[in-house]
Amino acid sequence: MGVIEEGAKKSGVLWLSLDRPRLAWHAWHDGAIYVVTGGGEQPLPGLAERGEVQVTLRSKDNGGRLIAFDATVEVVDQAESADAVAALAKERLNAVDSAGLVERWAARSQVVRLTPRESAP
């Protein structure tokens, strides 16, 4: 998983294959990618209902495709995954309510863990 981890840590955005390719900001934490959707955050329609999604990471150097891989999708309990939610909040740029961000997510958004499948490089 070296290329995936390195790419996810270096780039602040990725592409998800949903109803159409969707750009999403994210955080890498504990071997997985975390994204937040809904409640005024980035719209990622249908992600939370999926079991799997294709993720494409781009190169921070030239913006080109670095690697694409399948990941399992799991909506996390935000209270039980507080460290991951904190890592994700730290990556949130230009939040209008940064002081109440985590509380707003808990009330109105879903935090989703994308775990690279074992066959991913």
Enumerate the language-model features and the residues they cover.
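Solvent-exposed, well-ordered amphipathic alpha-helical segments
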Residues: 1, 19-21, 73-75
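Structural motif corresponding to alpha-helix initiation and N-cap regions
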Residues: 1, 40-41
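Extreme N-terminal tail/first-helix region
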Residues: 1-14, 63
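Short, well-ordered helical secondary-structure segments
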Residues: 3, 22, 56, 60, ...
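Short amphipathic alpha-helical segments and helix-helix/interface helices
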Residues: 4-5, 44-45, 85, 102
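Generic secondary-structure transition motif, activating predominantly at the C-termini of alpha-helices
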Residues: 8, 12, 51, 89-93, ...
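Short beta-strand segments
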Residues: 9-39, 45-47, 53-57, 67-68
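Charged, gly/pro-rich active-site loop segments
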Residues: 62-121
